[in-house]
Amino acid sequence: MTTATGRIALFIPSFSDGGVEKQMVALAGGFAQAGYPTDFLTRPGELPYLDRLDPAVQLIRLPAARNAQREATIDYLRTQRPLVLMSAKGKDDLLALDARDAAKNAAGGTRVFLRCGIHLSSRPKMVSRNPLRGLWHRWRLRRLYARPDGVICVSDGVADDLAQLTGFARARIAVIRNPTISAGFDARLAEPLDDPWFAPGAPPVILGAGSLAPVKHFEVLIEAAAALMRTRELRLVILGEGKERARLEALAGSLGIRDRVRLPGFVGNVLPWMRRAAVFVLSSEREGSPNVVTEALACGTPVVATDCPSGPREILDGGRFGPLIPIGDAAAMQRAIAAVLDAPLPAATLQSAIAEYTLPRACAGYLRAFGLAG
């Protein structure tokens, strides 16, 4: 029987512009620098963050069409025979497992790992008003998670939720923190930011970042900021793009703060913005392990976050490194932001919160989970 090589393949054909993509690019470089041949399988096109991919990583472009991606992945497994194929996003999990099964005889033992970065039971389809719809999705998840060789989660809360929802044994789930602090972090942090709102002497800036989607609840952040602006000279910047843009801009206008709110769109490097912000605010209704929170802390920037399932509480150590507030509560958010602005924690204290979120620690954890290191 043909044996698999020591090659690691990161599988992300649904690549977009989120935090998962940044983390996987960093991990690929970490594996390659640790001496493991590493492939990065993704879709065609001009994609963000790929300029950060380590030159030692082999970038493999899959076709754009989903059916063609399946056939190309099967062919890849048959010819390259990686030891590990890790699916990085839930959209790609079934494709990875089906390709492994179709290529099994020739792949010679490739093992598929699924990486879960979201709190599954909080998704709208899992809490649908139609109980049959929720049961259907739970049944599908249980079938899906009966198939991988291993599962990796980004937080304890995500792992606990996944085990309960799918029946996958909690003891078999590896929890590995995201590699937020990776190669080039300091250089990206030091990049200049030519923006008058962040110039010395300008009013303090409240910062949010993420896709402009309903799940992020940036409308709550705008409402809280508007209340604060009645008595304080402040500005609000929300980085990201999405279908909620028009609604958020209209809300800022209706609250009379349109000239003090900006939505610059997608930004490839958020660190210079975070470094100069007075406070970073996470307003989401659900997160797995929000990279923006760990990035802000790494910059020494105070954080306010919703106590949503499941990452903020773990990162902020139950509120020790930043206030945790109820989801959707603009008044509580207003009070928390005011408290942080009046008495911010020292930067060194905030930075100490993310000691586990480094590329070397993450790589070591993944290699242990893959059975490649002790």
Question: What are these regions, as identified by a protein language model?
Answer:
Residues S87-D93, C116:
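Short His-centered aromatic/hydrophobic patch
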